[in-house]
């Protein structure tokens, strides 16, 4: 909730006598944008200071004696951690967390620099995993979102580095990230953290499939397991944040199947998983998902699984079925957004419907229509749909607000 939103909705609460004018002013006073902006400054300053120190040390590293290098690493890291703890005890949380984050960055930089000093050869990302584990422990110690995001970034980048540099996937890094940071996400029920965790998990699942050269459909088993976990979260916003990235991944896959699938040239070996195991896994996840939805009284959201229908195993009509799935899913999101009067879901559904329409337009007209005419008509169609859907959204939301009076 932001100050701007409170200032917009507050007068209506006063008008309905839900709160008094004095209470409204007190609530607005709790959301001081100036204090929030000032609180961000130490975090930004810590990032700039860390980059400056790393740049300076890297530029002069070879000229510094080895013993002094090691001493510098220990002193800088200790100073940041000590300073962070001192400021936290003084009640200056933002500055304390910023210095602690610099200590974490210094720890990771120290691992790399010590390896260079003693010419240590790495064959995996164990050192990065230790760095991420340290960040996870600090996250629990200080209950900090900033440290959480840094730790999540460390694990994600480390996994990418492992697959690119060493051509191997680190199950240890994934397990520590999923269990350690996943449990913290479950505890905090914070929308931003949940979004970021979901994105990192999906990206690492993609890296796993690519590194192991498995059939691509296996990607959706762990991804939809994450989606299923979201059905057991009571808070709607947090559950939706956990599920949105898996749904986006399934939506993009459906778009690819519509636009690029060709039975004559497509390689099924790179795409299709073993039917019995894959479909059985999806059915099991679907059952657990529906059970969670029914428990949370969100049974209608089971329709979201239409994007996971295994149309790709059919012998014909694959593009048409995936295109229909795109439209049905878009209509469903719009419909739920209007029923729940949830502006984010309405906007998201509007975007999905426009994307689905443009995918259908491109699929049906690209091969035979003049390209200039294709883009002109496509632009006009896009503008018309955008205008109509936004107008419809405003009308429905206005009617809903009018009905509350």
Residue ranges of model-derived segments:
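Alpha-helical multi-pass membrane segments and their bilayer interfacial helix-loop junctions
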Residues: 1-405
């Amino acid at each position: 909730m932001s100050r701007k939103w409170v200032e917009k909705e507050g007068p209506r609460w006063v008008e309905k006598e839900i709160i008094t004018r004095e209470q409204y002013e007190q609530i607005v006073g709790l959301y001081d944008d100036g204090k929030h902006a000032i609180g961000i400054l130490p975090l930004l300053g810590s990032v700039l200071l860390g980059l400056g120190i790393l740049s300076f040390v890297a530029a002069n590293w070879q000229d510094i004696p080895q013993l002094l290098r090691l001493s510098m690493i220990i002193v800088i890291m200790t100073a940041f951690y000590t300073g962070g703890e001192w400021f936290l005890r003084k009640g200056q949380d933002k500055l304390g967390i910023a210095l602690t984050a610099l200590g974490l960055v210094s720890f990771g930089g120290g691992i790399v620099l010590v390896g260079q000093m003693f010419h240590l050869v790495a064959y995996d990302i164990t050192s990065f995993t230790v760095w991420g584990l340290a960040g996870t422990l600090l996250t629990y110690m200080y209950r900090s979102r900033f440290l959480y995001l840094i730790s999540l970034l460390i694990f994600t980048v480390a996994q990418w580095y492992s697959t690119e540099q060493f051509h191997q996937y680190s199950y240890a890094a994934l397990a520590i990230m999923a269990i350690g940071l996943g449990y913290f996400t479950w505890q905090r029920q914070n929308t931003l953290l949940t979004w970021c965790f979901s994105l990192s998990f999906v990206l690492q699942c993609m890296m796993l499939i690519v590194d192991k050269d498995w059939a691509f459909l296996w990607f959706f088993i762990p991804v939809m397991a994450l989606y299923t976990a979201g059905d057991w979260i009571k808070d709607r916003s947090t559950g939706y944040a956990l599920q949105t990235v898996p749904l986006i991944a399934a939506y993009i896959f459906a778009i690819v199947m519509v636009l690029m699938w060709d039975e004559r040239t497509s390689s099924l070996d790179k795409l299709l998983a073993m039917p019995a195991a894959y479909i059985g896994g999806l059915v099991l996840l679907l059952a657990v998902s529906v059970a969670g939805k029914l428990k949370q009284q969100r049974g209608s959201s089971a329709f979201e699984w239409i994007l996971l229908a295994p149309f790709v195993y059919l012998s014909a009509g694959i593009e048409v079925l995936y295109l229909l799935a795109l439209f049905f899913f878009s209509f469903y999101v719009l419909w739920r957004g209007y029923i729940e009067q949830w502006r984010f879901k309405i906007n998201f559904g509007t975007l999905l419907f426009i994307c689905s329409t443009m995918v259908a337009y491109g699929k049906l007209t690209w091969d035979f229509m003049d390209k200039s005419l294709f883009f002109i008509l496509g632009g006009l169609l896009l503008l018309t749909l955008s205008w109509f859907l936004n107008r419809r959204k405003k009308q429905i939301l206005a009617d809903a607000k009018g009905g509350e009076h």
